[in-house]
């Protein structure tokens, strides 16, 4: 699947919203399961495409460590995708705050080097900013170590996911299949899109792959951080 034409053939009579030529150029080929595609180089899988989504942008968003992506688009493109996405989310939130609170955030959070470090690891700007705000409000000071910040971010992401699942469960009368679909997607390996996630990467804390796919990588497919240790977990 290293060749563009070979990848393009796999799409056959592709009937989904994203252009198959763009998908093939971005390194993806169809795996024959609805609109699921997979990168020939990094093995990263994507599905549930929305109209007007850019395959290159989605590739950079979810698998920034892919060498094919890096060769074709470069580090600057990947960094811009993540930075633009983070700043767009932050702009809406910041404009809603009072001037005094905005100044306090700028003075205590934006100069903190751990803010950029967390973003480079794949965390969303607004999530990092929010958790730093909460830290300042409860303890009077910002984070001192990146390890503690990452641990709190991972914990917050887990709580958010559980809350979202609980909220969708209350909407079963409106859409009975939606909560189950989202739960299944949350638990799927982001590389093979087939088996359940089962390994946490240390130190970045991402839980995105099954045991088999985790054995084949030495960098986190989510944030491209070097993996020091792989911790097996068992999902209920």
Swiss-Prot record:
Residues at which Zn(2+) binds: 39, 42, 59, 66
GO cellular component: cytoplasm; nucleus
Subcellular location, record wording: Cytoplasm
Keywords: Apoptosis, Cytoplasm, Metal-binding, Zinc, Zinc-finger
PROSITE patterns assigned: BIR_REPEAT_1, BIR_REPEAT_2, ZF_RING_2
Annotated Pfam families: BIR, UBA_BIRC2-3, zf-C3HC4_3
Keyword check for DNA-binding: no
GO MF, one example: zinc ion binding
Zn finger (RING-type) start-end: 189-224
GO biological process: apoptotic process; negative regulation of apoptotic process; positive regulation of canonical Wnt signaling pathway; positive regulation of protein ubiquitination; regulation of cell cycle
BIR repeats: 7-70
Matches recorded under Gene3D superfamilies: Death Domain, Fas, DNA helicase RuvA subunit, C-terminal domain, Inhibitor Of Apoptosis Protein (2mihbC-IAP-1), Chain A
Tissue-level expression: Testis specific in normal tissues.
InterPro entries in UniProt: BIR_rpt, BIRC2-3-like_UBA, DEATH-like_dom_sf, IAP, XIAP/BIRC8_UBA, Znf_RING
Main location: cytoplasm
Phosphoprotein keyword on record: no
Assembly behavior: Binds to caspase-9.
Family statement: Belongs to the IAP family.
Role noted for this protein: Protects against apoptosis mediated by BAX.
Annotated protein name in UniProt: Baculoviral IAP repeat-containing protein 8
């Amino acid at each position: 699947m290293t060749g563009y034409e070979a990848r393009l053939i796999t799409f056959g009579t592709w009937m989904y919203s994203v252009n198959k030529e763009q998908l093939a150029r971005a390194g993806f080929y169809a795996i024959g399961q609805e609109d699921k595609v997979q990168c020939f180089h990094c093995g990263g899988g994507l599905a549930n495409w929305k109209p007007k989504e850019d395959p290159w942008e989605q590739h950079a968003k979810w698998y920034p460590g892919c060498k094919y992506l890096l060769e074709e688009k470069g580090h600057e493109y990947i960094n811009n995708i993540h930075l633009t996405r983070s700043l767009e989310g932050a702009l809406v939130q910041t404009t809603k705050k009072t001037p005094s609170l905005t100044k306090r955030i700028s003075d205590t959070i934006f100069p903190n080097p751990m803010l950029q470090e967390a973003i480079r690891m794949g965390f969303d700007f607004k999530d990092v900013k929010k958790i730093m705000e909460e830290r300042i409000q409860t303890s009077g000071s910002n984070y001192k170590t990146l390890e503690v910040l990452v641990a709190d971010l991972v914990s917050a992401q887990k709580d958010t996911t559980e809350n979202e699942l609980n909220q969708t469960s209350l909407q079963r009368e409106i859409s009975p299949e939606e909560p189950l679909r989202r739960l299944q997607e949350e638990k799927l390996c982001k590389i093979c899109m087939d088996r359940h996630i089962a390994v946490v990467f240390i130190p970045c804390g991402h839980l995105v792959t099954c045991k088999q796919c985790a054995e084949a990588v030495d960098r986190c497919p989510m944030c491209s951080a070097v993996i020091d240790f792989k911790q097996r977990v068992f999902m209920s």
